[in-house]
Amino acid sequence: MATAASADLDYVRTLGADTVLDYEKQRFDGSATRVDVVLDTIGADTQQRSLRMLKPGGILVSVVSPVPESTQKRYGIRAAYFYVGVTTARLNKIAELFDGGELHTDVGTVLPLEQARTTHEMLGGAPHKCGKIVLSVAA
């Protein structure tokens, strides 16, 4: 199960999701389906609603914030906080994977640094193309 905006539903299906919910029209926690694993990239209320979607013994992996031990016990789940520290070596490896075609991403919008405010508005829900939003820094 995955969630996406209306405009992105078909794209998310191409990534392999069997069930895709339109989060603009349907709350994911309204589904009767309980899941084994949640990857939380939002946090806050979304994380709380995700906890209720997990099967007993399920796992919540968060890239936003750790889940307190008391919360894990209350829901009968396990949780992991996943954080990748950025280093020059890691960035070089990522660049190598992109250059070799082993890793790719879909870039939807590229804007100059001077339009950083616009990118924040897009992240907050303003219309934009499907894919990553990139700020370009002049050399």
Regions found by a protein language model. Name each.
Residues 1-139:
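Terminal helix/beta-alpha structural elements that buttress the NAD(P)+-binding lobe
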